[in-house]
């Protein structure tokens, strides 16, 4: 598959009152680039949607949690090529966020969600998606 569009993915590195970070895994049926790895909650920004609104919507859809965005993180991008053709071009726009409400419950496209202590993140390093590793380093939580 060759893509002709750039995806803008928005999300959050969410911390609870105990200093733990929220990670999710997508359902197997969804497939795709992030399948089978732990990632931070997020997804595609919709046309006409403000970045902050998109982040809060995606977090609510995937986890049923309410958050407060505290500070933006440096955006980064990923370009995936197969046989010389671009199959994915995504620009990540993420924020640090604090949990403010709700009860953790996975949405329809998420099969697992866990809170992980910052000191425990190295233990699941290989289970983190490579872009999530970069994001967590940018957020200075690892």
Give residue ranges: language-model regions.
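Conserved Nudix-box catalytic region and its N-terminal flanking loop in Nudix hydrolases
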Residues: 20-61
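Active-site segment of metal-dependent pyrophosphate-handling enzymes
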Residues: 64-101
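A generic structural micro-feature
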Residues: 2-6, 37, 85-91, 110
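Short, charged/polar surface micro-motifs in flexible loops or helix N-caps
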Residues: 15-20, 29, 46, 78-79, ...
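Conserved N-terminal beta-strand and adjoining loop/helix that marks the start
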Residues: 1-22, 96
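Structural detector for helix-capping/boundary residues
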Residues: 43, 57, 70, 116-119
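Nudix hydrolase/Nudix homology domain
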Residues: 31, 105-142
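Short, well-ordered beta-strand micro-motif
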Residues: 14, 94-98, 114-117
């Amino acid at each position: 598959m060759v893509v002709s569009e750039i995806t803008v993915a928005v999300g959050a590195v969410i911390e609870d009152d105990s200093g733990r970070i929220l990670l999710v895994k997508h359902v197997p049926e969804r497939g795709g680039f992030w399948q089978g790895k732990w990632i931070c909650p997020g997804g595609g920004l919709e046309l006409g949607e403000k970045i902050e609104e998109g982040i809060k919507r995606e977090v609510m859809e995937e986890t049923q949690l309410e958050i407060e965005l505290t500070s933006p993180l440096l955006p980064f991008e990923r370009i995936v090529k197969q046989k010389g053709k671009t199959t994915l071009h995504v620009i990540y726009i993420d924020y640090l966020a604090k949990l403010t409400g709700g009860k953790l419950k996975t949405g329809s496209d998420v099969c697992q969600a866990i809170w992980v202590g910052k000191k425990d993140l190295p233990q699941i390093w290989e289970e983190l998606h490579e872009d999530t590793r970069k994001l967590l380093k940018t957020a200075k939580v690892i």
